[in-house]
Regions:
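A short, proline-enriched helix->beta-strand linker immediately N-terminal to the Walker B motif
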Residues: 169-173
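Conserved ABC ATPase signature
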Residues: 150-154, 158
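Short catalytic/signature loops enriched in Gly
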Residues: 4, 237-284
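Conserved ABC transporter NBD signature motif
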Residues: 64-76
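A short, surface-exposed alpha-helical micro-motif characterized by mixed small hydrophobic
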Residues: 217-219
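Conserved ABC ATPase "signature" region
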Residues: 76, 127-145, 254
Length: 284
């Protein structure tokens, strides 16, 4: 295993509700390695998104880190001021949200939004910027005609691909994808995940995929962390999780994954998931 790019060390996050502290994330530790695809799965309210926002220093009040630290390239993110954070976002780490419409400015054309991201990080060469923008659109398989369109003119899948293009614009080494396909239909979901896979392979970017669809993340992730009630209850390589899950919640998640071939139901669903993952990885 390569060197840890992101280190999450004993993080506890609390929300204050009517004077009472409620733990959303409870003493969580996890390493994310260079060139790794790792998934964090669990039901709604398990603490996944709260942890993801904390990793990127985007946690909003009343959420507060009350213990632990998060390191990126061995540098404590809590030590960064707002200007340093602004500089590092997009260029070193970035976010793909589950609601792409919320991350895109509705009154700006797509090209203007991409250009703004480059200008905000000191990229002023117009020719180079145009070339870079066209390149990232090619990477997410979008026509260059999208550049002259507004977000409301795009389908859900196209908007999500634009969000991915924004996230990779400055070649960050770490991306958090927070349920990037949750609002899309099944076919588009798999296209989005396939796009993430291609991006990761080309740029060797570390990606943390947040999700609740275990069947989907199995086809993407090298390792899977299972979160329940604010704790990571299991963290294993994907194949090992399928073969030897130990926590009752992980086992329940695995049993809830629907068969991919309903007309030919197998007696061992875990074997089917493994075969599906192997086929998906071979296709890529």
């Amino acid at each position: 295993m390569s060197e840890a790019l992101v280190k999450i060390e004993n993080i506890t996050i609390e929300y204050n509700s009517y004077g009472k502290a409620i733990k959303a994330v409870d003493d969580v530790s996890m390493d994310i390695y260079e060139n790794e695809k790792i998934a964090l799965v669990g039901e709604s309210g398990s603490g996944k998104t709260t942890l993801a926002m904390a990793i990127l220093r985007m946690l909003k009040p009343p959420g507060k880190i009350t213990a632990g630290q998060i390191l990126h390239k061995n540098f404590n993110l809590n030590d960064l001021d707002e200007e340093e954070l602004r500089t590092r976002r997009l260029s070193e780490f970035s976010l793909i949200t589950q609601a792409s419409m919320n991350s895109l400015n509705p009154v700006l054309r797509i090209k203007d939004q991409l250009v703004d991201g480059l200008l905000d990080h000191g990229k002023f060469n117009k020719e180079e910027n145009n070339s870079k923008i066209q390149s990232v659109l090619d990477q997410v398989q979008l026509s260059h005609s999208v550049l002259n369109m507004y977000p409301h003119e795009l389908s859900g899948g196209m908007k999500q691909r634009v969000s991915i293009a924004c996230a990779i614009l400055l070649n960050p080494d770490f991306i958090v994808a927070d349920e990037p396909s949750s609002a899309l239909d099944v076919i588009i979901q798999r296209q989005v995940i396939s796009t993430l896979f291609s991006i990761q392979k080309k740029y060797r970017t570390s990606i943390l995929l947040i999700g609740h669809d275990l069947g989907l993340v199995i086809q993407f992730a090298d390792r899977i962390a299972v979160m329940h009630n604010g704790k990571i209850v299991e963290l294993k390589k994907t194949e090992d999780l399928l073969d030897s899950a130990t926590h009752w919640y992980t086992k329940a998640l695995l049993k809830s994954v629907p068969s991919f071939e309903e007309e030919q139901k197998a007696s061992n669903r875990f074997d089917k998931l493994k075969k599906t993952r192997e086929f998906s990885q071979d296709k890529k």
